[in-house]
C-alpha cells in the first residue's frame, strides 16, 4: 500500500476529523488521529472478523457518531454522516466511529508523544556526538549533553597534557591545574591558589563534590579553561618533524531503540435469556452495551498505564538542585517550617508549594535541554491547593477553589496554573503527590511515547459447550521511552537496546518527569 503524506491523510479523513456534531479534535492532534484511522482501515481490508454478520448487526445500532446500516466503502464523509448504502456487509465504519470517539480522549495525547506504528515493531534512532576517536568504545562520553558542561580543555591544553583528578587527602599545589567530575554538572578544571589538603573523609562522590565546592567558595580552587600554546599546536600538526602528538578527536554514533506492540484484550459472555429480557424490558441491545463497556474499559486502562509509567519513571523530585537544605528529599511537608519557609497562614504555605513546582520545572529544562516542565499530574487534594492559592506576585491569598475544575466526574483536566502549567487530576492516587513533566511542540519531544498500532479489533463467537454468545475487543499499541530520557547517563549504553520502559532503563531515571509526595495538607 502506498504511504500517504500528512496532507493526503488529513484530506482523506477530514470529514471524520471535523464532522458536524462530533467532539472537536485540536488541530495539533488531527494528523496523528488521521494516521490511526489509516492503520485501522488497513486492518479492515485484511482481517475477516470485521465481516462477521452478528457483530455487524450489533454495531448497527450502537454508535451515534458513525451509525451504519450498510457498507460505506470507508468513505469518511459517509461514515461521519451516518449514511447507509444497503445491507450490512462489514462493521469497519462503525469501529472507525468508536475509534473516533475514544482515542482522542486518551490522556496520552496531552502528556506523551504519540507516534502511530505501521507494523508490530517500531524503531527510534538517536544520533550522539561522542568524545574520542572510537564512538562505541566502552565509557566514551557524550558531547553536547544538556546536563553536563563541555570538556572545556578537550581541544585546548587538555589535548597536550593530562591533568590529575582530585581525590580525598590530596595536597593542592599553587598554580597546578586539577580536574574533577561533578555528579550534577560534569567535568571541570580547577587551579589551586594556595596550599591546602582535601578533606580525608571525602571518600565518596557526594562528599568529594561537597568538599570541592567548599574549597571553590573559599577561593582555594578556581575554575579555569585554556587553549593550547601555538608551539604545541604546531607540534600536533607534525611541524618540524614532530611525531606522537595526535589531535584529540570526536565522532558520532547512531543508536537504535526497538519498540514492540503489545496487546490488551477483554471478552464478555451473556446468556440468550439475558439478551431477550434486556431487549423486551429495557429496549436495550446486549451486544451494544457490552461493546461499550469493553471498549471503554480498555481505554481507561491505557490511560492508567500511561500515568503509571510516567510516575514510575519520574525522577525523585525535591532532590539535588531542587532540595531545600535541611528538608526531606522527595517530600513536600506542609507541617515542615523549612518547606513552607515559615509561612504564617495557609495561603503563604500554598505559595511555597508553587515555588517548589517552579524549581522542579526548571530542573527538567536543565537536565533535558528541551524546556521547562509544562504540565502537572496531581492528586485531588494537591489540585485543590493549587486551585485555592493566588498565583500572582502579591500577598498570599487563600480562597475557594473556583479557578479550576476539581470534579473528576466532569473531566480530569483541571485547568491551567499561572498561565504555564496544564494541570491534570490523578483521580485514583493512593496518596497526595504532584508530578511535573514536559511535552514539547512536536510528538518526538516527550519523555514517553504512546505508539498505537491497531486501535480496536472486535471479535465474536459462541461457547461450544452451551452456545452462549461471546464477544471481545483487542487493541495493540506500544509504549516507548525517549532515548535521551536518562540524563545522568553521559556514557551511552549499547547501540541496540529495548526502547520499552523497564526497571533497568526507567525506574526513577526519566529526566522529563519529576515527582514529589505531599504531606500535611
Swiss-Prot record:
Taken from the record, one Pfam family name reads Gp23
Q: Does the keyword Transport apply?
A: no
Q: Does the keyword Transmembrane helix apply?
A: no
Q: Name one GO cellular component term.
A: viral capsid
Q: Quote the InterPro entries the UniProt record gives.
A: CAPSID_Myoviridae, Gp23/Gp24_T4-like
Q: Where are the residues marked Cleavage as a site?
A: 65-66
Keyword list, A-Z: Capsid protein, Late protein, Virion
What does the entry's PTM section describe?
Answer: A proteolytic cleavage by the prohead core protein protease gives rise to the mature major capsid protein during virus maturation.
What binding partners and quaternary form does the record give? Homohexamer. Interacts with the portal protein. Interacts with the capsid vertex protein that forms pentamers. Interacts with hoc; one hoc molecule associates with each capsid hexamer. Interacts with soc; this interaction reinforces the capsid structure. A total of 960 subunits of the major capsid protein forms the 160 hexamers.
Please describe what this protein does.
Answer: Major capsid protein that self-associates to form hexamers, building most of the capsid in association with pentons made of the capsid vertex protein and one dodecamer of the portal protein. The major capsid protein self-associates to form 160 hexamers, building most of the T=13 laevo capsid. Folding of major capsid protein requires the assistance of two chaperones, the host chaperone groL acting with the phage encoded gp23-specific chaperone, gp31. The capsid also contains two nonessential outer capsid proteins, Hoc and Soc, which decorate the capsid surface.
Q: Which family does it belong to?
A: Belongs to the T4 phage capsid protein family.
What name does UniProt use for this protein? Major capsid protein
Quote the gene name from the UniProt entry: 23
